[in-house]
Amino acid sequence: MLRKMTIEDYEALFAMWSNTPNMGLRSLDDSKEGISRFLERNPNTNFVAYEGEILVGAVLSGHDGRRGYIYHTVVLPEYRRRGIASSLVDMAVEALRQEGITRVCLNVTEANEEGKKFWLEKGWEKKDFLGFYSKAITDKENRQLFRVQP
């Protein structure tokens, strides 16, 4: 079953993220409070997939009014190659389109070969001419990674 994500999905969602290789999680942004804030700002653009009571996939996406962003897309390994990720992404992109967004961006860690292949197969383009820059604007404690699986 595919449906909109709610904060009630958080514990299962965080467990899935934590056990996914190459998933970088930030202590502030990916905390329950951080995700709750994100869902309040983007209530219609995040989706989960359940098989019975088991969370098997999710997409976290939102926008700033100009561009859409996909932050985390994950499907449990034993449920991959069934079209779940594609369906979740399609739902997120359509939700962003309905909110007036005309371009969606995402980042994939260089080590995530399976992820890079997925996005290319879905018709996304890698923009080699862009550099990705980031600056934390909070204290060091809140910027730490929960964990990045190798």
Task: Pin down the residues of each PLM region.
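Short acidic, glycine/proline-enriched helix-loop-strand junctions
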Residues: 114-127, 132
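Conserved GNAT acetyl-CoA-binding A-motif
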Residues: 96-108
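Short helix-loop capping/hinge motifs at secondary-structure junctions, enriched
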Residues: 139-143
